[in-house]
């Protein structure tokens, strides 16, 4: 019986030692490869964004634009960019991205770099700026704002040339 008690005490001591040493803190391993920047980590925390595609195809009833729809077809009535942003915020979105220029080449802001833009549409008598209106609404309602600008431009005759790259960067 005395031997059994000694073995039990020894077993308890071994188990207790193992438990205590397994609770010791260990340093994390060094990272391997590139680490995300603080800005990139913050971007990943933004889980929900509205991505809105609105442009000439909305009014031409087309799924795919070729850059040949006249700017005069963009004529939204009662467009309320603040309403879009409010709905996005109510839906839990943290930001709003507008397709400012899709592959058809039409620009939703009054750029001087191309005639194929909102200033040549009847919207607000050519003085409209949907990109600017959305940006202001996002700022007012506390949403982040972004634009999608397609690198492909079916309306630009110089697409695919070094001159086009310069034009694209100026946009």
Give the residues covered by each predicted segment.
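Bacterial N-terminal signal peptides that target proteins for export
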Residues: 1-11
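C-terminal motif of bacterial Sec signal peptides marking the signal peptidase cleavage site
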Residues: 21-22
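Mature catalytic domains of secreted/periplasmic carbohydrate-active enzymes
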Residues: 25-171
């Amino acid at each position: 019986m005395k031997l059994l008690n000694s073995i039990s005490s020894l077993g308890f001591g071994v188990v207790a030692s193992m438990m205590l040493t397994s609770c010791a803190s260990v340093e994390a391993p060094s990272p391997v490869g590139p680490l995300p920047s603080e800005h990139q980590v913050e971007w990943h925390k933004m889980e929900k964004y509205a991505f809105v595609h609105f442009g000439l195809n909305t009014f031409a009833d087309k799924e795919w634009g070729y850059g040949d729809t006249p700017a005069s077809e963009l004529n939204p009535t009662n467009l309320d960019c603040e309403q879009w942003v409010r709905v996005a915020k109510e839906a839990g979105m943290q930001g709003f991205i507008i397709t400012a220029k899709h592959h058809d080449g039409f620009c939703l802001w009054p750029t001087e770099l191309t005639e194929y833009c909102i200033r040549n549409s009847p919207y607000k008598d050519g003085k409209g700026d949907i990109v600017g209106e959305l940006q202001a609404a996002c700022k007012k309602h506390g949403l982040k704002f972004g634009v999608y600008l397609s690198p492909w431009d079916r309306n630009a005759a110089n697409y695919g040339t070094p001159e086009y790259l310069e034009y694209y960067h100026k946009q």
